[in-house]
Structures are given as structure tokens and as C-alpha cells.
């Protein structure tokens, strides 16, 4: 089966009982070793279905609007559309992608904090009326270019103000909300609700307590000014673990009952992104170069072996100018799995992992302990479904990794039993036999 670099015409392999994702990865490693050793993804769409079931079981009162920029692969968007999620879009292209799947405009919100006028006009043209806004200038742009806009006022949380760099730029203060509401009234812009965002890195449950209290204050302010608000967006920040989802629900559920009880007419939504897709994708990369260095060249405080032992720098065929782009703005906590078999008592060496660009920024893992690897060996990175699918840089002729989609028969049956269908997606399934033999050159050669 070919992997789809432009996966608009993707196919999905249905795994027979006895075939697991590890078998599939083994086989593609074998194929890619023979044909060019390019990096590749394997996506398990069944995990997305499971995440949605988990969401419905834990926080059924909150409608998810999937954050498209997190992973806009057509297969991902199509399965989420079939599951009935909404979509949070940051650009014209993202809005167009989900509308091509037949998603109605009322299930799309335009969440970019800094909107281009042409894209506001596009949203107005296609009927995407729900937008977010956190300042007067954006409010005036919306008033001039989107006559049917319904705005969610984006408020800052203590988490944002406290200094997470990626978030502190966005969200207005509670103190400024009355001014913005009065401006909206003068501009005849309809304010329909409030949005806030708590990052996944935040460990303080009190941030949700304060954010929901602030949101209630803004609802009350809006009522005094003459707005009737009916939507609360609690943002993203969901990591994907059931434990974290239950923890958040434990905090917010009683507060929602107090501030926005059932029957109040307020619809509660959220913007999960990595929650749905992170664990669904695995990335396989190849070692293309290797250097032996002195152990003391590694910074103090990182995991190291004895100073008299060698250390290794490994260069991979994917990096921050490709699938690891998010490493430029956040830490990567994933330590890869070595694909080749090695003995349990094989010595481990201090190692660092780098992308292929030779740029000092292209360091993927600063330090980890690995057995000695050779050029041509493979490393497997789990949880690579979020923020990994950007267009690669043209530098050094980087190639976008192929994507191979899979789903177990049990997950497929679960979809059918739940009444989840998509005509176009159903055409893309093909059967994967359980007898994958890595010794055969043509193994797993079924075409979509």
C-alpha cells in the first residue's frame, strides 16, 4: 500500500484479528528500508473514535469543537465530522476544508485572535458567524466586514497572565470587558458569549475556578448592557488522558451547575485538539548520520552514563523543519523506541537526537540513554499526531513523510454500531490480512 503524502485520497487498512499496529510499523520499516528510508507516519483512526467515546462518557454536557490547526489531515477531519464534532478554524483554508466535508456553518467557529480582513469577509460569505475577539481593533474589523457576526469575548485566565508565553498575548482582562461590551453595543455587534483557555501545562485547578467566575461576571455585565448571551467556550488544554479529563470535569462540573445550570440556555463548548489526535499517530524516522563525542560535552543535569564512556549524536531524516516543528516552541517529552531488537543487558550510552538540517535549533532530544545505533537504524516516536503535519521547509529538500492509515475491525464495528458513517470514508477501507510476513518483498502491497 502506498503512503499518502497528499492524503486527500487516503485509504484506511482494516486490521484483521491478530494483526496489531506494531506489525504494521514493522512492515513499513522493512518496505522503507528497501525503497529509500524516508520517515513515515502510521495513523490509527480507531483511537480517535475511542477518544470521542471517552469524551462523551466523561463530559457529555460539553460539545467539542475540534481545533483544526492541530492536525488538518483529511482522514482526521472526515472521521471527526462523521462523529458529529464541531470545528474551530483559524483560517480561510481550514474553514473551506471542513465545509467541503458537509459540515454546516453553525458547527464552525472562527477562532483566530488576529484576523485578516479578507478572511473575515470569507467567513461572512460562507455563513461562519461565530467568531472570537479580545480587543477593540478586532471588534471594529468584525463590525465593518461581517454584518451577521456573533462574537465570543475572549477573556484571559490567570494561567495566561501568569506568563505562559504562547498564551499571554491573547485574551482581554476582566477590567476591560465592560469597555468592549459597550463598544460592541455602539458598533451593533452581537456578543453571544465568552471564551477562555487554560493550557494543558497548567496544574492548578483554581485557574478554572477563577476563569468560570470571571465568565459569569462577563455574562452579568453583558446583561446589564443589553446583550443576551448563550454560549460559553472553555477552550482547549486537554492532553488526551482520561485521568486529566476526569480531573478537569471534577473541577468544572459543580461550577457549571452553579454559574451556568442546565436550563439557563447557555451552550457549553470546548476546543480540544491534541486530545483527539496526539496518541493516534506514530512517527518512524531513520538514522542518517552519527557522531561519537566525549561524554562531558553534554550539559550538566542531563541523564548521562560514566564520563569515561563515549556519547553519541544521531541525525535523523526528520526534524524541527518538518514533523517536529512544535519542538521550536515547547519541550518534547517523548523518548523514542529503538526499532531494532537488542539484548536486555546491552549497554546504554548518553545520546542526543538531531534533525537533518545541521541547524543548532534542530535538536529533538537533548539527552537520553540508548543502545549504540548505526546509520540505517529506525526510531519510533509515539504520540505524534498533534502539530506534526505542517508543510516541511524546502531547505535541504526535506520531504513530507507518507501517512498510512489503519483501524482495527473491532473499532470499525464500533463505528457502525454507533451509526457513524461517511459515504466517502467507506470507499477508502481495504482489508489487511493477519499474515504479514516481513521476509516477503511484496508484503502488505494492497492498493487503495
UniProtKB/Swiss-Prot annotation:
Q: Tell me a GO biological process for this protein.
A: positive regulation of polyamine transmembrane transport
- Matches recorded under Gene3D superfamilies: Alanine racemase, Lyase, Ornithine Decarboxylase, Chain A, domain 1
UniProt KW keywords: Nucleus, Polyamine biosynthesis, Ubl conjugation
In the record, which residues are listed under signal peptide?
none
Output the PTM entry.
Ubiquitinated, leading to its proteasomal degradation; a process that is reduced in presence of antizyme OAZ1.
**What does the entry state regarding organ or tissue expression?**
Expressed in liver.
Q: What is its main location?
A: nucleus
Q: Where in the cell is it found?
A: Nucleus
Q: How does it assemble?
A: Monomer. Interacts with OAZ1 and OAZ3; this interaction disrupts the interaction between the antizyme and ODC1.
The UniProt entry's sequence similarity note says:
Belongs to the Orn/Lys/Arg decarboxylase class-II family. ODC antizyme inhibitor subfamily.
Question: Would you tell me the protein name for this molecule?
Answer: Antizyme inhibitor 1
Q: What is the lineage of its organism?
A: Eukaryota, Metazoa, Chordata, Craniata, Vertebrata
Q: Which gene encodes it?
A: AZIN1
